A protein has these predicted regions:
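Short aromatic-enriched loop/helix-cap "lid" or pocket-rim segments at secondary-structure transitions
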Residues: 10-11, 53, 135-137, 169-173
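Conserved SAM/AdoMet-binding glycine-rich loop
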Residues: 1-122, 127-132
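Auxiliary Fe-S-binding modules of radical SAM enzymes
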Residues: 32-37, 108-111, 115-116, 138-141, ...
Length: 251
């Protein structure tokens, strides 16, 4: 968790108090290294952010200042159902998640030099936790709809299935219905909002065309000879970074 690096009470406290100074020292030190191009982090604990908003806001500002654009903080809510939350000892509820997402959106929506918002939250759900029911999926969708109505940007919604002993069976019908609703109602619309027509993304690395993957040796002049150009179609590429956007271009 990015926000608990050298935090106060990591062992003793349920919600350790974030310490902005060492995080700022680390990230600014990394950013000052000219050898470093892309700098991203990953997980953030939304409950800790919500319970310590003042310190977390200072850290968020540091992240926006130092990270490359397109950075994502993965928030593991896992479930918006209070019953699932209680039965599985989850450490973040929907209220805390909303507070954390609002803070990240407040500072992270600004676009960087490559064309993407500087820092956005990602949201994780897990299916198959104990206490889950059809009500659970309804509460998850309700939360997502509220976040959308409130105008928050979410970079991606990740839906996983729990593995291991001691968990209940997943209702396949409910799970597929929830997953399809998320893909149709949120994934596409959120990307369209984040990347409206006319958005320019710089530094895209083209990786694949017609089922063929681009390799380092293909950067040489012998691979650029016009006489060996492939057939027309869609060429796919991505920017370097965490959770990069897949870009397709006619070529």
């Amino acid at each position: 968790d990015t926000y608990t690096y050298m935090a106060e009470g990591v062992v003793e406290m349920e919600y350790p108090r974030p310490n902005p100074e060492p995080i700022a020292k680390l990230l600014h030190g990394l950013r000052d290294d000219e050898r470093l191009g892309i700098l991203h982090t990953d997980n953030g604990n939304p409950s800790i952010i919500a319970e310590h908003l003042e310190e977390s806001e200072e850290i968020t500002k540091t992240l926006v200042e130092t990270l490359s654009d397109g950075a994502v903080l993965s928030f593991g809510l896992e479930s918006a159902d209070p019953n699932v939350h209680e039965e599985n000892w989850l450490n973040c509820d929907a209220k805390q998640l909303k507070s954390a997402i609002a803070l990240i959106n407040k500072h992270g929506r600004t676009r960087g030099e490559r064309g993407l918002p500087k820092l956005l939250p990602g949201l994780n759900f897990i299916a198959g936790l104990n206490g889950e029911s059809s009500i659970t999926y309804g509460l998850n969708l309700k939360l997502l709809r509220e976040l959308k109505e409130e105008g928050h940007m979410i970079r991606r919604v990740n839906i996983r299935q729990v593995e291991g002993e001691g968990f209940q069976e997943i209702d396949d019908v409910d799970f597929r219905s929830f997953k399809n609703s998320v893909r149709e109602e949120f994934d596409g619309p959120l990307l369209e909002e984040m990347l409206p027509i006319g958005t320019i993304l710089d530094d895209v690395w083209w990786e694949a065309h017609d089922g063929r993957t681009r390799l380092p040796r293909h950067l040489g002049p012998e691979a650029r000879d016009p006489t060996i150009h492939g057939k027309p179609g869609i060429t796919f590429g991505r920017q370097i970074g965490a959770y990069p956007i897949l870009v397709g271009m006619n070529y």
